[in-house]
Amino acid sequence: GWMVTAPSMSPEHGPSGEDTKKASTIVAGCTMDNQIIFDVLSNALHASRILKMSASYQDSLRSMLNRLAPMQIGKYNQLQEWLEDLDNPNDKHRHISHVYGLFPSNQISPYTHPLLFQAAKNTLLQRGDEATGWSIGWKVNLWARLLDGNHAFRIINNMLKLLPGDEVKEAYPQGRTYPNLFDAHPPFQIDGNFGYTAGV
């Protein structure tokens, strides 16, 4: 069987698919956990080669890597957020943790994993562009990683619209930036600013 984290949860988000009846947010082996563990083990293996660590230690890392649950494509051609196919294509939640493998990690590439690449793109299309600042900043980077500079630029343009007043009065306001160029969110989200600059 696969090695997975348990208990696990996809940050601030639980399955709300058609068949889940708002199931528990606690699951086993959500996709983001598996992606982060893949990076940790891969980096440890790389370091162990450089440091000429024992063959048995390197073999144990390889064995764990080979037993991790793989990323999976669901019935809506999306990258699954959970081991089970529980995603809802109408879910517009701002958290998109399961595309960590696309960015900031580099596990999903159009050259090595074209089907996962398309599934990650489908996930972003299903979730939409509206979100709070930190999530918008991340989406700029995700669309850039998806080789769609026009989509990333559209998000940047929306992000840099000035807020009509001096405070945020709704979840997703028309303006996303204060006059001082801080990302608009009560009080503000510096992650949005940092995400934007990383995407550029």
Description of each model-found segment:
Residues C30-G199:
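Active-site core of glycosidic bond-cleaving carbohydrate-active enzymes
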Residues G1-A47:
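Acidic/histidine-rich catalytic neighborhood
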